[in-house]
Amino acid sequence: MGIIVYKPTSPGRRNASVLNYKEIITKTEPEKSLVFTEKKWAGRNNQGRITVRHRGGGHKKKIRIVDFKRDKDGIPAKVEAIEYDPNRTAFLALLCYADGERRYIIAPEGLKVGDTVMSGPDADIKVGNALPLKNIPVGTMIHNIELMPGKGGQLCRSAGSVAQLMAKEGKYALIKLPSGELRYVSQECRATIGQVGNLDHENVRIGKAGRKRWMGIRPTVRGSAMNPVDHPHGGGEGKAPIGHPGPLTPWGKPTLGYKTRKKNKPSDKFIVKRRK
C-alpha cells in the first residue's frame, strides 16, 4: 500500500503524508447491522472527572463490532470487503459466512476480497484462519492472540503487528511478541494466522496539529511551562530546572522510566523474558 506525500503548498502540508486508501479500501460505508454510536466522553469517567488527559473533540465516529473471538467454527466465510475503521490503525475485513451471517475481523496482510477464511481446530494454516495454538505449527506468524481461552484476541491487533509461535511445552505455548517479550499462553487460546495489515501506518507523517485534533487528541502542555500550583516542574525564572531528583507527574509521582507494573502480578510466572 502506497503513501501519498503532499507537496509543500502550505506550512501544514509541508511535512504531511497520507495512506493511499484507494489501493485497498473496497467499501466506503460500514455494514449497518455491525455499527453503533456512542457518546463522546472526552477522557471523563462517570463522575465527569478527567481520568485521561489530552482527549476531546475530534470527528464523529461509529463503533464497529469486531469479532475477536473467531468462535464460528467449521463454517467457511467469504471476504466481501476491506473497510476503513476510524477506531483502530488496522483495516477491517467484512466476512459473509455460508449461513448468511456477517462479521468484521481485523484484516491481515494479503487478505483480499473473494478469499475464503475459516476458524476452528480443523482450519488450514492459511492467512486469516483462526485456530487454537495447539493446532498451529511452531514458527508460524500469528496475530489477534487470546490470553484466556474464549475471551477473544487481546494481543497483536494494531497495524503491522505480528507475533511468532516459538515452542509448545505441556499445556502452554511460548510466543514472542512484537515488544520482544517471551511469554507462555495456554495452548487452548486461539490466534489468527498472518500479520495484521496496513504495514505503512508507521510511515505516515501527521504534518500538523489539526490532524491530531481531528483524531480527538488535544495538546500536551509541558510541566515546566506551568505555575508551581499546577505542576511540580512549574515556576522559577525563565527556563528553570525542575528542582527535583527526577521528573515527576502532575501528582508528584516519579515518571519517565519509573516501573509502573504491579509487583508480584499473577501473570509474572508466564513471562519468560520481559519486553525491551
UniProtKB/Swiss-Prot annotation:
Q: Which UniProt keywords apply?
A: Ribonucleoprotein, Ribosomal protein, RNA-binding, rRNA-binding
Keyword Ubl conjugation, does the record have it? no
Q: Where is this region: Disordered?
A: 223-276
GO BP field: cytoplasmic translation
For this record, the Gene Ontology CC terms, alphabetical, are: large ribosomal subunit
**Tell me, what does this protein do in biology?**
One of the primary rRNA binding proteins. Required for association of the 30S and 50S subunits to form the 70S ribosome, for tRNA binding and peptide bond formation. It has been suggested to have peptidyltransferase activity; this is somewhat controversial. Makes several contacts with the 16S rRNA in the 70S ribosome.
Q: Where does this protein have compositionally biased stretches of type Basic and acidic residues?
A: 265-276
**GO MF terms on file?**
rRNA binding; structural constituent of ribosome; transferase activity
UniProt similarity note: Belongs to the universal ribosomal protein uL2 family.
Kindly give the SUPFAM superfamilies that the UniProt entry links to this protein. Nucleic acid-binding proteins (SSF50249), Translation proteins SH3-like domain (SSF50104)
Query: Which species does the entry assign this protein to?
Result: Caldicellulosiruptor bescii (strain ATCC BAA-1888 / DSM 6725 / KCTC 15123 / Z-1320) (Anaerocellum thermophilum)
Name of the protein? Large ribosomal subunit protein uL2
Its assembly, as annotated, is: Part of the 50S ribosomal subunit. Forms a bridge to the 30S subunit in the 70S ribosome.
- State the HAMAP family in the record: Ribosomal_uL2_B
